[in-house]
Regions:
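Haloarchaeal acidic low-complexity proteome signature biased toward cell-envelope/secretome components but also
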Residues: 1-14, 43-47, 180-194
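Metallo-beta-lactamase
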Residues: 34, 112-191
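Active-site HxH/HxHxD metal-binding segment of metal-dependent hydrolases
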Residues: 31-101, 186
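Histidine-centered catalytic micro-motifs
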Residues: 51-61, 106-113, 169-174
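Conserved beta-strand termini and adjacent loop/short-helix elements that scaffold enzyme active sites
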Residues: 7, 78, 89-91, 105-107, ...
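Residue-level marker for buried hydrophobic side chains located in beta-strands
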Residues: 27-29, 52, 103, 124-126, ...
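Conserved beta-strand hairpin/beta-sheet module of binuclear metal-dependent hydrolase folds
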Residues: 1-42, 116-133
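Internal catalytic-core helix/loop-beta-alpha segment
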Residues: 90-118
Length: 194
């Protein structure tokens, strides 16, 4: 069973959450920024197999280089041309994160290279900055942001998860482990209204 912990918990700087998924393949989903991620990974698991990025905004990738240096791992992300990304992820690709088989869902709107990672069998979603707890959704006023595209991405996510969702790990704020689909539905409604 995959254990997921937020190694950015308690950090008091402008960072994203950074989720360490432990299991068959120990993976860091987003690296955060402005704290010693490598030390927190070492303390939690003693090792790392890969980094996977939901997107490449600075608050999600600021610690990537120090993590790569500490653990000599490759980085996976949607944009293979980004200097921090070693391996491109395409929509529909499957990646092992912890013990879970995750499908990459290209979900632009907040940023063109945004992906969510959904493990149907485990009922786990790494949502990045697409949606948050309590109906929040990613900003669309930043470069590459587009509200209509974000709404389409949230609707695509709802169609994909079909109710088999037990935990949603988001880019900012608390994880959602009680009825996460409801929070995605709220985000879809809120994004449509704006």
């Amino acid at each position: 069973m995959t254990t997921v912990r937020n190694i950015a918990a308690g950090v008091r700087s402008m960072t994203s959450n950074a989720f360490l998924a432990d299991g068959e393949r120990t993976v860091l989903v987003d690296a955060g920024d402005g704290f010693d991620a490598a030390a927190r990974i070492e303390e939690a698991t003693g090792g790392l197999d890969a980094v996977v990025l939901t997107h490449t905004h600075p608050d999600h990738v600021g610690n990537v280089e120090s993590v790569v240096d500490a653990f000599d791992v490759d980085v996976w992300g949607f944009d293979p041309d980004h200097p921090l990304v070693d391996h491109g992820i395409a929509d529909g690709d499957h990646l092992r994160i912890g013990d879970a088989e995750c499908e990459a869902l290209h979900t632009p709107g907040h940023k063109n290279d945004h992906v969510c990672l959904y493990a149907r069998g485990a009922g786990i979603l790494f949502a990045g900055d697409l949606v948050f707890a309590n109906g929040g959704f990613g900003r669309t006023d930043l470069p590459e942001g587009d509200r209509e595209t974000l709404v389409d991405s949230v609707e695509h996510l709802l169609e994909t998860v079909e109710g088999s969702l037990d935990a949603m790990y988001v880019g900012h704020g608390p994880a959602v482990e009680t009825n996460p689909r409801y929070h995605v539905e709220l985000a879809a409604q809120a994004a449509r209204m704006g």
